[in-house]
Swiss-Prot record:
It catalyses: N-(5-phospho-beta-D-ribosyl)anthranilate = 1-(2-carboxyphenylamino)-1-deoxy-D-ribulose 5-phosphate. Gene3D superfamilies: Aldolase class I. It comes from the Bacteria. Its EC number is 5.3.1.24. One of its GO terms (molecular function) is phosphoribosylanthranilate isomerase activity. It is an enzyme of class 5 (isomerase). This is N-(5'-phosphoribosyl)anthranilate isomerase. Pathway: Amino-acid biosynthesis; L-tryptophan biosynthesis; L-tryptophan from chorismate: step 3/5. It holds the Pfam family PRAI. Keywords: Amino-acid biosynthesis, Aromatic amino acid biosynthesis, Isomerase, Tryptophan biosynthesis. GO terms for biological process: L-tryptophan biosynthetic process. Belongs to the TrpF family.
Length: 220
């Protein structure tokens, strides 16, 4: 299996081009005003037009007002919505658009393999479950979490595709892939020079590290 790669927190056209040229499968726009990577829907709509076919656009929200989500759906037309706050399963599904549900792994109530797996099961309609590290903020913290907490999810035959995030970069993503065998990895701060400013060299190095890990798993 090939590990898919999403580069999140894009704010500049040049960074989208770098991600696409390196082979990223998806790019993410952050619509959470509290983030340093926040983009206005008008800008995201312009940037979205530079994304070629067969590269997914993901819109990230944190506890949004329904009108704000609908505005992004209308203006930007993302392929997927990523919910990164405290949204219920019904709130995630209400828009009729494929969605990812993020879990702040290690947070109270999500701090054992059993508790985490149980929380995930409520979101069985999701296109994927994304696991990020728990911190005071939401996403892009650059912090890793104990991947042993995913044991219950990985053992669940009904689990949705596992998307690994949280403190990933070119130096550690290979080890994480070999340990967790995720469907995809989601990286933001690990390929940045500053919040919202991606490094082409770091993006290329990350994609190379992912491919090398996949080759090792295939015995190549």
């Amino acid at each position: 299996m090939r590990t898919r790669v999403k580069i999140c927190g894009l704010t500049r056209e040049a960074d989208i081009a770098s991600a696409v040229q390196a082979g990223a499968d998806a790019i993410g726009f952050v619509f959470y005003p509290g983030s340093k990577r926040y983009v206005q829907p008008v800008l995201a709509a312009r940037l979205r037009r530079t994304v070629p076919a067969f590269v997914d656009v993901v819109a990230l929200f944190v506890n949004p007002a329904p009108a704000d989500v609908q505005a992004v759906l209308d203006q930007v037309g993302p392929d997927l919505i990523q919910f990164h706050g405290d949204e219920s399963a019904a709130e995630c599904a209400r828009y009729g658009t494929r969605f990812l549900r993020a879990f702040r792994t290690g947070a109270p109530g999500l701090d054992t393999p059993g508790n985490l797996a149980a929380a995930c099961r409520a979101y069985d309609a999701a296109a994927g479950w994304l696991f990020d590290s728990y911190s005071a903020g939401y996403g892009g913290s650059g912090q890793a979490f104990d991947h042993a907490l995913l044991a219950g999810v990985r053992a669940d035959a009904a689990a949705r595709p596992l998307i690994l995030s949280g403190g990933l970069n070119a130096a550690n993503v290979g080890t994480a892939i070999e340990a967790c065998r995720p469907w995809a990895v989601d990286v933001s701060s690990g390929v940045e020079t500053a919040p919202g400013e991606k490094s082409p060299d770091k993006i290329r190095a990350l994609l190379d590290a992912v491919r090398q890990a996949d080759d090792r798993l295939r015995g190549l």
